[in-house]
């Protein structure tokens, strides 16, 4: 496994989706860029908002694709190709229906669990190599509600608080070693 050189938050670029469950990957990138005092700037050639910061002399790029979720892979591929970053050096941050709000899970592999943004990344890269995902729990809808509608709705106030607390705790827990290989071995679920 390689060191992390790029962190991408998956989401839909349309403004009305900013605070929805499906955009928690964007929430993560916004909070991380704020934590490291770096600002995201739109870069047309990468179809997304890009920034970078140094952590213990290791440069880490941040990316928020400016595309719909099912096209996020194109933005990820454009930035990673330009800077010669392998898929295995990318941390993909995304929402996860199978985890409750406030629970995070790091997973390593090539599975997408039905997530269209992750599918887009897998389909865009020629070599199907394992990569790291930070799955942010958003919970499942009650009473078999339509999942597509559920992920495009804003979470409740308490769920929003739990999700943001979990993100912040993860940022604090990983700030000293996210660039190290040891980070990749940690697949624990974090309860907040």
UniProtKB/Swiss-Prot annotation:
It catalyses: an N-acyl-L-alpha-aminoacyl-tRNA + H2O = an N-acyl-L-amino acid + a tRNA + H(+). Pfam families: Pept_tRNA_hydro (PF01195). TRNA binds at residues 17, 68, 70, 116. It comes from the Bacteria. It is an enzyme of class 3 (hydrolase). The record marks 95 as: Stabilizes the basic form of H active site to accept a proton. GO terms for biological process: protein quality control for misfolded or incompletely synthesized proteins; rescue of stalled ribosome. SUPFAM superfamilies: Peptidyl-tRNA hydrolase-like (SSF53178). The keyword Lipid metabolism does not apply. One of its GO terms (cellular component) is cytoplasm. The record marks 12 as: Discriminates between blocked and unblocked aminoacyl-tRNA. GO terms for molecular function: peptidyl-tRNA hydrolase activity; tRNA binding. Its EC number is 3.1.1.29. PANTHER family: PEPTIDYL-TRNA HYDROLASE. NCBIfam families: pth. Hydrolyzes ribosome-free peptidyl-tRNAs (with 1 or more amino acids incorporated), which drop off the ribosome during protein synthesis, or as a result of ribosome stalling. Catalyzes the release of premature peptidyl moieties from peptidyl-tRNA molecules trapped in stalled 50S ribosomal subunits, and thus maintains levels of free tRNAs and 50S ribosomes. HAMAP family: Pept_tRNA_hydro_bact (MF_00083). Monomer. Belongs to the PTH family. This is Peptidyl-tRNA hydrolase.
């Amino acid at each position: 496994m390689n060191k992390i050189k790029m962190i991408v938050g998956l989401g839909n670029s349309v403004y009305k989706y900013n605070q929805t469950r499906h955009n928690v990957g964007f929430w993560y990138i916004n909070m991380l860029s704020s934590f490291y005092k770096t600002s995201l700037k739109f870069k047309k050639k990468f179809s997304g908002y890009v920034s970078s910061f140094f952590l213990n002399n290791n440069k880490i790029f941040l990316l928020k694709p400016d595309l719909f979720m099912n096209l996020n892979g194109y933005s990820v591929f454009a930035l990673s190709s330009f800077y010669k970053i392998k898929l295995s050096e990318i941390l993909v941050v995304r929402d996860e229906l199978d985890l409750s709000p406030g629970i995070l899970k790091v997973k390593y592999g090539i599975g997408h669990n039905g997530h269209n943004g992750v599918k887009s990344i897998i389909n865009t890269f020629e070599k199907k190599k394992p990569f790291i995902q930070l799955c942010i729990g958003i919970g499942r809808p009650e009473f078999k509600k339509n999942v597509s509608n559920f992920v495009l709705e804003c979470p409740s106030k308490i769920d929003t608080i739990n999700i943001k607390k979990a993100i912040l705790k993860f940022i604090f827990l990983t700030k000293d070693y996210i660039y190290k290989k040891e980070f990749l071995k940690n697949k624990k679920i974090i309860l907040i």
